């Protein structure tokens, strides 16, 4: 089997401090979990799944839970915008491209706040032409997707945003990709592999690429990355029993990259004990 080259990745972990509002929300999630466990609330009103979803939204952007909350200056969204703009600016001559993955807060087209529109609006405000930024969700036929992917490969569309289901397997736009951004943490190791497989791919003209992972410290981000690591370890144990040498090398690389961005403060450790069933 041919061992064709793929780009070398530089992993950049952007670990950001939570806002005061986010810290208050995390404390409230713990209280909600206690009430759910004690059956003090109707499960149709609140439950562990709802708390988890709210926790993930809080870690991504506090405005997803309350649009009236301020736009935190050092949020994941604003840090991603800053990085994406810098990469875009540095790659003007070669028309390099970027992918931004975000599984939560996808565009609905109904006027409600979402991360996709917020990112695009801020990038346009910085000077990026709107036609160079695309959402995969706006291309709902195979013909439209093929046209979009061709524009990305040609460097006409230079920033493409999407979710794992829509921008994962089968997306071949690697030609000019220079950077990939994880705005939120996927649920499954295979999702992470699918996302990063878009850029760490044969046919990429760039020898070195950047992969940004954004984590809001002391929020559910840490919990989600911990779950991902636990699942990867389980899969790795199975792999190791089948092929010790090769699997061990793969496991070490994966485990280290997860461990670097894992931050488990006391509140997250407490939630992990309460919700250990979610790792099953």
Residue map of PLM features:
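Inter-lobe connector of SF1/SF2 helicase motors
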Residues: 1-72, 76, 83-86, 98, ...
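Short glycine-/polar-rich loops that comprise or flank the Walker A/P-loop
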Residues: 9-11, 129-132, 157, 175-180, ...
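Conserved nucleotide-binding/hydrolysis micro-motifs of P-loop NTPases
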Residues: 19-23, 105-107, 140-141, 166-168, ...
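Conserved strand-helix element at the start of the C-terminal RecA-like helicase core
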Residues: 40-51, 93-119
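SF2 helicase motor core recognition
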Residues: 108, 146, 160-182, 188-205
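Conserved helicase ATPase core of P-loop NTP-dependent helicases/translocases
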Residues: 120, 124, 129-164
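A conserved SF2-helicase RecA2
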Residues: 190-193, 199-275
């Amino acid at each position: 089997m041919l061992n064709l080259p793929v780009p070398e990745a530089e992993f950049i972990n952007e670990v950001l401090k939570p806002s005061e509002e986010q810290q208050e929300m995390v404390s409230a999630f713990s209280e909600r979990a206690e009430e759910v466990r004690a059956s003090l609330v109707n499960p149709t009103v609140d439950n562990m799944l709802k708390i988890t979803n709210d926790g993930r939204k809080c870690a991504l952007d506090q405005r997803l839970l309350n649009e009236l909350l301020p736009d935190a200056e050092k949020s994941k969204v604003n840090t991603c915008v800053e990085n994406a703009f810098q990469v875009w600016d540095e790659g003007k001559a070669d028309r390099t491209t970027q992918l931004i993955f975000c599984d939560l807060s996808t565009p609905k087209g109904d006027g409600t706040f979402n991360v996709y529109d917020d990112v695009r609006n801020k990038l346009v405000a910085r000077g990026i032409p709107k036609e160079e930024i695309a959402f995969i969700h706006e291309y709902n036929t195979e013909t439209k997707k093929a046209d979009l992917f061709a524009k990305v490969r040609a460097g006409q569309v230079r920033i493409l945003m999407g979710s794992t289901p829509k921008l994962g397997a089968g997306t071949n736009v690697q030609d000019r990709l220079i950077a990939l951004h994880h705005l939120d943490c996927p649920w499954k190791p295979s999702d992470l592999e699918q996302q990063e497989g878009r850029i760490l791919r044969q046919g990429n003209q760039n020898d070195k690429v950047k992969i940004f992972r954004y984590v809001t410290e002391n929020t559910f981000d840490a919990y989600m990355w911990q779950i991902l690591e636990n699942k990867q370890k389980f899969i790795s144990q199975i792999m190791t029993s089948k092929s010790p040498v090769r699997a061990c090398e793969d496991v070490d690389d994966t485990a280290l990259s997860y461990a670097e961005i894992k931050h488990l403060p006391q509140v997250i450790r407490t939630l992990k004990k309460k919700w250990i069933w979610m790792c099953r």
